[in-house]
C-alpha cells in the first residue's frame, strides 16, 4: 500500500459535500490515520463540478467515472451518487483493485446489493476493503449505548423502538427531486432514512430482523418538475411529475433474539428536522437516544430500587468515550459532520492495518433485504413477510 491514500469521490451533492469535509479533516484530528490525498472529484456537470472541486478542496475534476477508476494513482473510490449507480460504480472499482466506501442504502434493491456484496467478498481475498457509510454508527453516544448493551447492562432485550422524522418535503410545491423518483432512489423515506434506523438497531443489539409487517404512504402524488439542484433541493421548472416513492414508512419487526421492534420513517413530521431516535428496552434497563440531542444518551438502570428509578443523562463528551478524545475538552459538543470524519477514519485505518471495516457490504445487503421485505409487505395488505 502506498504511504498516502489517494482518493477519488464520485458525486458532489449533499453527501459529496459532507464526505469532502471528512476527507479534508481526518488527518488534522486523527494523527494515526494514513495521509489522505484528495486527488479527484467526479460528476456530470462540468461547470458545477469545477465549482465543487474548488469549494471542497479536491486537486482535479473529471466527468467520466470510468476514467477515474482506471487511473493507477487512485487507491480509494468514495461513491456518493444516487442509488441507481451504486452497483455499477462500486463493482467496477472493486474489480479494479480500489478500496470502496459507498453511501447508504447500498443499492436500490436486494438483487443489486447481492451482486455488490459478492464483489466485495471476492475483492477482500486480495485485501481490497469495502464499507457502506452508515454514519450514525459513529455517533459517540450511540457507541456508548452499544457498549452498555454488550456489557449486559440492559439484560435480555425485549423492545426496539426507532423513528426517523423529517419535514423537508411537506410543502406540496417542493420540487420533484431525484429522491422522489423510484428509478433513481429505489424508495423514499424507507430507503433514505429508515435504512439508518434498521442499521442502528442491528449495530446496537447485534440482532437481525427476521420478519416485518409494513405500510407505505405517499401523501403528495404530484410535484413541480425540478430545475437546477442545490444540495437536497432544487429550483422548479415548467410542468409537474408523479411522485413514485413513499413519503412515509411504518413497520413492526421481529428479531432473531426474540425481541420485537417498531419503526417509523417520514418526511412529513412538521417541526421535526432530523429527529432520528432509538430506544432499546431490556430486562435490566433501557437506553434512549435522539440525534437532535446527539451528544447525550439517556440510560435507565432497572436494577435500582423503584424509589431511585428514572432515566439519567449521560454526556458523550468525555475523552474516554469512542472518538471524543480526538476533538475537544469534555463538555464541548460535536456535530453531524464529525460522524463522517469518524467513519472515514475507521475506514482508512482498516486499510492501513488490513482489518475488515464495518459495516460491510454484507451488512448493507441485510438492510436492503429488510427494506425489500417492508415494500413487499406493504404491497400485500401489511402481510407478515419474512426477510430473505
Where are these regions (language model features)?
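Glycine- and charged-residue-rich phosphate/anionic-cofactor binding loop of Rossmann-like
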Residues: 35-39, 350-367
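Beta-strand-loop-alpha-helix segment that lines the small-molecule cofactor/substrate pocket
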Residues: 75-76, 82-137, 152
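Glycine-centered short loops/turns at secondary-structure junctions
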Residues: 97, 127, 152, 258, ...
Amino acid at each position: 500500500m502506498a504511504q498516502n491514500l489517494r482518493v477519488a469521490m464520485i458525486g458532489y451533492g449533499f453527501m459529496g459535500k459532507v464526505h469532502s469535509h471528512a476527507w479534508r479533516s481526518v488527518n488534522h484530528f486523527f494523527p494515526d490515520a494514513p495521509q489522505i490525498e484528495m486527488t479527484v472529484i467526479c460528476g456530470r456537470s462540468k461547470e458545477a463540478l469545477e465549482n465543487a472541486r474548488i469549494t471542497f478542496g479536491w486537486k482535479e475534476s473529471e466527468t467520466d467515472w470510468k476514467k477515474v477508476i482506471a487511473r493507477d494513482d487512485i487507491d480509494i473510490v468514495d461513491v456518493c451518487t444516487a442509488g441507481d449507480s451504486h452497483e455499477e460504480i462500486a463493482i467496477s472499482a472493486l474489480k479494479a483493485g480500489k478500496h470502496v466506501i459507498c453511501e447508504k442504502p447500498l443499492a436500490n434493491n436486494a438483487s443489486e446489493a447481492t451482486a455488490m456484496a459478492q464483489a466485495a467478498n471476492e475483492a477482500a481475498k486480495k485485501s481490497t476493503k469495502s464499507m457502506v457509510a452508515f454514519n450514525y454508527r459513529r455517533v459517540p453516544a450511540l457507541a456508548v449505548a452499544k457498549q452498555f448493551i454488550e456489557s449486559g447492562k440492559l439484560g435480555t432485550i425485549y423492545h426496539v423502538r426507532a423513528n426517523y422524522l423529517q419535514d423537508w418535503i411537506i410543502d406540496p410545491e417542493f420540487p420533484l427531486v431525484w429522491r422522489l423518483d423510484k428509478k433513481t432512489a429505489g424508495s423514499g423515506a424507507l430507503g433514505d432514512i429508515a435504512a439508518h434506523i434498521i442499521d442502528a438497531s442491528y449495530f446496537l443489539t447485534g440482532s437481525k430482523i427476521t420478519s416485518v409487517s409494513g405500510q407505505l404512504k405517499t401523501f403528495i402524488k404530484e410535484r413541480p418538475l425540478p430545475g437546477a439542484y442545490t444540495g437536497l433541493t432544487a429550483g422548479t421548472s415548467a410542468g409537474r411529475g408523479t411522485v413514485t416513492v413513499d413519503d412515509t414508512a411504518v413497520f413492526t419487526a421481529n428479531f432473531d433474539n426474540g425481541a420485537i421492534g417498531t419503526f417509523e420513517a417520514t418526511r412529513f413530521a412538521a417541526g421535526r428536522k432530523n429527529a432520528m431516535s432509538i430506544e432499546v428496552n431490556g430486562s435490566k434497563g433501557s437506553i434512549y437516544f435522539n440525534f437532535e440531542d446527539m451528544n447525550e444518551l439517556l440510560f435507565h438502570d432497572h436494577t435500582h430500587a423503584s424509589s431511585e428509578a428514572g432515566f439519567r443523562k449521560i454526556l458523550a463528551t468525555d475523552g474516554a468515550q469512542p472518538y471524543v478524545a480526538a476533538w475537544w475538552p469534555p463538555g464541548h459538543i460535536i456535530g453531524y459532520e464529525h460522524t463522517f470524519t469518524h467513519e472515514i477514519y475507521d475506514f482508512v485505518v482498516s486499510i492501513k492495518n488490513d482489518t475488515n471495516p464495518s459495516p460491510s457490504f454484507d451488512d448493507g445487503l441485510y438492510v436492503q433485504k429488510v427494506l425489500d421485505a417492508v415494500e413487499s409487505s406493504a404491497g400485500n395488505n401489511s402481510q407478515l413477510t419474512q426477510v430473505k
